[in-house]
């Protein structure tokens, strides 16, 4: 790898560490020519499907957009950045596992909502209100009622 400081063609790896999720390798490098150190990150590049938008246009999958939209929904919520990264990684693995070359933006939105639902209910409602274009309070009430039904324990049967 070229040194970013002096452009020397060969650098030495001083230290390598695998990230907690095992998806990235962090390498500390040193240039023998200028003796400066720098860090590189190595990640497997996989071919994620293209995203088909509502208008039919196609765009490349952009991890940063998913992270940004989740961060916006989770703004001022007690969720760690690592949890967001892990959620985005799960979305990517689901897309890769599908084997599809294209994914509809609606499906991608549903995957994001599922991850937000598991992370933080407030963030889920925030995202859903924008994604599903809520127009009145009753739509918020419907989502909240879904949560109430899902979180309440089933009633015991009255069989004797």
Swiss-Prot record:
It holds the Pfam family Zn_ribbon_NrdR. One of its GO terms (biological process) is negative regulation of DNA-templated transcription. GO terms for molecular function: ATP binding; DNA binding; zinc ion binding. A zinc finger (unnamed) spans 3-34. InterPro entries: ATP-cone_dom (IPR005144), NrdR-like_N (IPR055173), RNR_NrdR-like (IPR003796). Signal peptide: none annotated. Keywords: ATP-binding, DNA-binding, Metal-binding, Nucleotide-binding, Repressor, Transcription, Transcription regulation, Zinc, Zinc-finger. Coiled coil: none annotated. Its cofactor is Zn(2+). Residues 49-139 form the ATP-cone domain. Binds 1 zinc ion. PANTHER family: TRANSCRIPTIONAL REPRESSOR NRDR. NCBIfam families: transcriptional regulator NrdR (TIGR00244). Belongs to the NrdR family. Negatively regulates transcription of bacterial ribonucleotide reductase nrd genes and operons by binding to NrdR-boxes. This is Transcriptional repressor NrdR. It comes from Paraburkholderia xenovorans (strain LB400).
């Amino acid at each position: 790898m070229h040194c970013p400081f002096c452009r020397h063609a060969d650098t030495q790896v001083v230290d390598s560490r695998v990230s907690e999720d095992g998806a990235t390798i962090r390498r500390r490098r040193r240039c023998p020519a200028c003796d400066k150190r720098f860090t590189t990150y190595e990640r497997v590049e996989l071919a994620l499907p293209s995203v088909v938008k509502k208008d039919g246009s196609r765009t490349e999958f952009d991890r940063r957009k998913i992270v940004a939209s989740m961060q916006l929904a989770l703004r001022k919520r007690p969720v760690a950045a690592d949890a967001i990264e892990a959620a985005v990684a799960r979305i990517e693995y689901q897309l890769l596992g599908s084997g599809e070359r294209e994914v509809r933006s609606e499906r991608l939105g549903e995957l994001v909502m599922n991850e937000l639902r598991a992370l933080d209910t407030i963030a889920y409602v925030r995202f859903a209100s924008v994604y599903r274009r809520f127009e009145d309070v009753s739509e918020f009430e419907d989502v909240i009622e879904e949560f109430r039904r899902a979180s309440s324990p089933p009633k015991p049967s009255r069989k004797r």
